[in-house]
Amino acid sequence: MTLEEVRKQIDVVDKQIKSLFKERMILADQVARVKAESEDAIYKPDREEAIITKLTGDVDDSIKKEYTALIKRIMEVSRKYQYGRTLELRNCLNVSFVTEEPKVKKLAMLKHELYICQGYSRDLVNTVSDYEQVMELIRKDEVDAGMGIFEDISYGVSDSLHEALAMNDLYIYRCDEVLDEGHRKKVVTFGKQLVVLPEHNRLKIVFVCKNKSGSLASVLSMISDYGVNLTEIHSVPFRGGEWNYRFYIELNGNLLQKEIQALVFQLINETETFKILGSYYCEQ
């Protein structure tokens, strides 16, 4: 058999796969409708593992890993579709935000970062020694917002500010870039409410993956499936019973977009912990 003949047979098989895939997605839509009504969970890892074990039981070892990967991928695509349909059928995204940027009269920031304060009178800025004190002033309503250097583009991110935002109910709503002695730095403003404006093009999130093989790859593949670009990613180890990592990701998108809402909905349901750290506009 020639290569051309083999390719023709592959084309026939691909058309059959396409037809079966379309049929399967019709069924996935029916599943989404039922689960939206019953509020049943879309992702059931134990059930998926049982199905994979059953389907791969009679598959030759030489192609078992490849078939397993295919089945997992089909399940991932089906779940993605179901999350989007569920939001269309039932408004169940539990994320509260406002659509107007708050007015800021008083700020809190680190004393050694006071030089990056722009647009505010310095006599209205409360300077402290660490970010926990900044967070405390905001919580007590003694200031309207906090400000800090989020990232030195030449060197890296501020782990302390990332961690402070991750551990508190505070959100970035503005990001400005300043030039300091030849170094470009991202300076963020953050407050009590998640603010989402139409012009925002960045969404900052933090999550912890489920502690199993391939979990991070699955999340990154999920984000890619929504056609969303990552503009920054880094991890920070922490001890929560056993060692794990918090992953901080900046997405190119806006929470007002349906696709981004579906992605967030899926991440909430398929990661160990998840939090939005902010929504803002960024030129870079």
Model-identified regions with their sequence ranges:
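Domain-level signature for soluble enzymes in the chorismate/prephenate branch of the shikimate pathway
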Residues: 1-284
